Amino acid sequence: STLFPYTTLFRSVIPRARGPVRSRDEASILAELRQLAASGYREVVLSAISLPSYGLDTGTNLVELVEHCAQVEGIQRIRLGSLDPDMLTPEFITRLAAVEKLCPQFHLSLQSGCTATLRRMRRVYTAEQYAQVVDQLRAAYGERPVSFTTDCICGFPGETQADFEESCEFLKKIGFLKVHVFPYSRRSGTPAYDFPEQVHEREKQERSRVMNGIAEEVRREVLAAYVGTEDDVLLET
């Protein structure tokens, strides 16, 4: 089947460059995991261009894959790559939280904490809906701590100072463990390239500097909450 689950300005380029969704066969994934486990690997990361779209072309889904990966003997921890918040349904979240081996750390694509900016990006979720997904994930894990990382763009065409400040406040509201902050890069071939109200390069860099500072403050606050707690850890070398 031909499936193009890409709805944003930049990501609309992906299907033109890479074609429709092509999910790797689950059997080959599990076989590789067994080989990795036999070689001493204890953690695996499932990653893709659009990870939640896994299985749309084969009649399966990401949750089933995670559940089956967790059954591989020797694999102690499973991580997920970037997830789109609009594709995380309540059932999806509930089933993920039930997988003990899944690390409760999620990279949820944000790009902006301002709904007006998200609309200009043609994102299909609002800042409020994003926050609801975060709340649902935290609720699903109960007393277990859940951490979030994300990406955020500064200076997307049309972003006002007020929009930027709203985005900064959103970072504080969510409490991200880490935020990858970067200035908007004008890419030919994307609709945003021709958008009016392009933000000056110097302003984009300044906003990135400010947001990075805020993100670091939030990170320290998140880490401070772990002081004095006990948990099982997987040592990395």
For each feature predicted by the language model, list its residue ranges.
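Short, small-residue-biased leader/transition segments that mark boundaries at the very start
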Residues: 2-9
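Aromatic/hydrophobic pocket-lining residues that form the small-molecule binding cavity
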Residues: 29, 62, 130, 164-167, ...
